[in-house]
């Protein structure tokens, strides 16, 4: 007989607080390890590149401009909106909006002296990652995932390849990680007939923070809404579509109107820029790209010329294999994963999601979020397999290892290490059951002590 641990579970509000507390503690621990690795190598989160050459000067300038604007308001003077020190002279709002002029978090620059801006920028990177995990947990719990699975999914989401590789080079790339889950939660509210406040606020926040990522999030939101509508209503209830569509569009326009002060000038400037209008031949990806992409699913070091940082932890990718090992379950999630994987293999998708410009998979944070959500969904049953499901899992694992490393581009040290960890996790699934039980026990005991 399988041993079970019986323990009184906290109430709903108490359990929510315990979940946030557990996430905060683990996030602080892992972030401390991450920061220690940088410190031991004599580095900080501010990497040479756009972070140092663009985002750091922006934050220094923005803090100075905010303080000057506050003095102008208090004295009745005009707030400066043009600066001749930017190039040969440029509009301040239009020039700086890409870097987060409308992002509420960047308003902290007004209270930090210029000499402390480096620490502020590093702190904002950590804060955005923390908020990304909180937003993911809210979305995951709304869709019925367990607290323990949600906790694992949030950590897999936050410490994936995208924030490590792209977020440190361009801190603004972290914005959609916490804005997009809020947009999805707002969409769920509209489907369920709830208040549109969250939907409007999420639209406005994303559009204020960065126009390009708002565009990507909007396209992906449409795909999400189509999937939810198809599952909820189906093709036989199309009479519900017009009023629902009117609500989605109408409330989205309200959110866009709120953000118009930075959104419209930024969009005009962006669409008129030479870089944005740059066209390149969108030839098919090389044959080995599929194998290279699979090999890098379990590593944070995968890189190509298209910003395809799709790596997650080995545990998260094991969740994907478990998902497909169990037939006739979570069909929508399976279709979603295959659909987004297909988009990563089509260069035209990267062009469309990059504003119909050059090919770039900067939307891959959504793929990472999906894999983290899959881990949260399958976590309760990750150690409970029927004999057929167990055979399916190891067959998928064998296929992955063969396919991922059949070309030399995929046989990197980090990819091999990630695959090795994946195999070890799959082989030690019985021990994982005991470890999961102990972790759940510790989780509820900590909740009881904390509350």
Where are these regions (language model features)?
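Membrane-interface micro-motifs in multi-pass membrane enzymes
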Residues: 94-99, 118-130, 156-184, 191-192, ...
């Amino acid at each position: 007989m399988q041993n079970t641990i019986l323990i009184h579970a906290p109430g709903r509000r108490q359990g929510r607080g315990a979940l946030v507390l557990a996430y905060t503690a683990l996030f602080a621990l892992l972030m401390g390890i991450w920061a220690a690795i940088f410190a031991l190598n004599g580095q900080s989160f501010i990497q040479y590149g756009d972070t140092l050459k663009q985002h750091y000067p922006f934050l220094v300038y923005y803090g100075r401009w905010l303080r000057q604007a506050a003095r102008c308001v208090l004295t009745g003077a005009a707030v400066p909106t043009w600066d001749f020190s930017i190039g040969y002279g440029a509009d301040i709002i239009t020039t700086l909006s890409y870097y987060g002029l409308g992002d509420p978090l960047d308003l902290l620059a007004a209270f930090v002296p210029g000499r402390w801006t480096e620490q502020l920028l590093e702190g904002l990177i950590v804060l955005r990652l923390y908020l990304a995990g909180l937003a993911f947990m809210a979305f995951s719990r709304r869709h019925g995932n367990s607290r323990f699975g949600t906790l694992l999914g949030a950590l897999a989401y936050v410490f994936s390849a995208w924030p490590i590789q792209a977020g440190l080079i361009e801190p603004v790339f972290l914005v959609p990680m916490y804005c997009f889950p809020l947009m999805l939660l707002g969409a769920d509210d509209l489907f369920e007939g709830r208040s549109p406040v969250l939907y409007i606020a999420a639209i406005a926040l994303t559009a204020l923070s960065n126009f390009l990522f708002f565009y990507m999030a909007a396209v992906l939101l449409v795909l999400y809404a189509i999937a939810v509508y198809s599952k909820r209503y189906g093709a036989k209830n199309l009479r519900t579509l017009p009023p629902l569509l009117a609500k989605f569009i109408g409330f989205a326009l309200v959110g866009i109107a709120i953000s118009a002060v930075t959104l419209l000038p930024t969009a005009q400037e962006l669409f008129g820029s030479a870089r944005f209008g740059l066209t390149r031949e969108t030839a098919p990806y090389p044959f080995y790209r599929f194998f290279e992409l699979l090999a890098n699913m379990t590593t944070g070091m995968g890189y190509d010329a298209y910003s395809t940082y799709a790596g997650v932890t080995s545990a998260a990718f094991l969740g994907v294999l478990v998902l497909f090992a169990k037939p006739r379950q979570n069909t929508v999630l399976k279709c979603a994963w295959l659909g987004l994987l297909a988009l990563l293999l089509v260069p035209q998708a990267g062009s469309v999601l990059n504003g119909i410009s050059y090919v770039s998979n900067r939307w891959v944070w959504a793929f990472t979020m999906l894999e983290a959500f899959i881990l949260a969904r399958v976590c309760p049953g990750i150690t409970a397999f029927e004999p057929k499901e167990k055979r399916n899992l190891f067959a998928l694992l064998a296929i992955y290892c063969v396919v991922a490393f059949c070309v030399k581009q995929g046989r990197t040290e980090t990819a091999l290490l990630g695959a090795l960890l994946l195999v070890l996790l799959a082989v030690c699934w019985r021990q994982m059951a005991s470890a999961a039980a102990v972790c759940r026990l510790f989780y509820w005991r900590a909740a009881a002590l904390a509350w």
